[in-house]
């Protein structure tokens, strides 16, 4: 990735560890200062409470189609299917926690991809796996680690890193690009089988250039932190933006 030619905003889901009882509860707002990672690219800090990892492993059944479709969306009826390729990367902590990490992460990604397929005919295809070492001191610098290794590749549309590094204090973090990059880069924390697919769909949406909805706005959308762990679709404005960017990736 040529950093001199591209201004990249980092949209980070700083899902801080706080007591969590209901996914419908409005996110607690915490003010933090803008910070920077080694690349000197700006990090937009917009925190969201991190849900505690589900104690019981939730079966990875598909999302119910009735819970994905937004009645205000019509894009799924118009667009031809577009397939995007995905490389899954797992760091040392994630691999240690999940010996079956390849099959697990594939299922998590495919579940997250249902919303993209149902609403926008974007088909997620996991085509390869790799390992990586998360050396960063916080969430943003760990994302930078992954980007350093894979940000310039054009072999995959998306590179999704999975981490269980204790220095990663977010539930997910991703680069939000102003135009099509060589590859979309994101890192997802291990939130368990229940909540991880929500984090993936949120961060991949950032890779497509989608910003957040304002907390407290009442807008039901996966890009609104108030509904990030309960909603599997986009609001009308994000639907339109995603549709306009769908050709950034895939074939």
Regions found by a protein language model. Give the residues of each.
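Sec-dependent N-terminal signal peptides
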Residues: 5-20
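N-terminal secretory signal peptides that target proteins for export/translocation
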Residues: 1-3
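Active-site-proximal segment of zinc-dependent metalloprotease catalytic domains
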Residues: 74-79, 89, 146-219, 224-231, ...
């Amino acid at each position: 990735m040529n950093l001199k030619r591209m201004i990249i905003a980092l949209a980070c889901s700083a899902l801080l560890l706080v007591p969590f009882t209901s996914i419908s509860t409005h996110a607690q707002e915490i003010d933090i200062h803008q910070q920077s990672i080694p690349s000197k690219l700006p990090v937009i800090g917009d925190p969201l409470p991190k849900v505690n990892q589900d104690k019981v492993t939730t079966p990875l059944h598909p999302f119910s189609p009735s819970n994905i479709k937004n009645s205000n969306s019509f894009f799924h009826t118009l667009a031809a299917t577009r397939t995007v390729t995905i490389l899954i990367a797992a760091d040392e902590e994630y691999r240690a926690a999940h010996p079956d990490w390849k099959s697990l992460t594939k299922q998590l990604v495919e579940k997250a991809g249902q919303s993209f397929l149902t609403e926008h005919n974007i088909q997620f295809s996991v085509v390869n796996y790799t390992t990586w070492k998360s050396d960063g001191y916080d969430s943003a610098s760990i994302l930078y680690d992954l980007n350093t290794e894979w940000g310039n590749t054009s072999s995959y549309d998306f590179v999704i890193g999975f981490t269980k590094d204790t220095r990663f204090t977010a539930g997910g973090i991703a680069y939000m690009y102003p135009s099509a990059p060589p590859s979309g880069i994101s890192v997802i924390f291990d939130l368990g089988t229940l909540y991880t697919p929500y984090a993936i769909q949120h961060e991949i949406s950032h890779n497509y250039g989608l910003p957040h909805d304002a907390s407290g706005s009442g807008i039901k959308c996966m890009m609104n932190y108030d509904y990030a762990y309960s909603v599997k679709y986009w609001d009308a404005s994000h639907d339109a933006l995603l549709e306009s960017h769908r050709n950034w990736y895939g074939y």
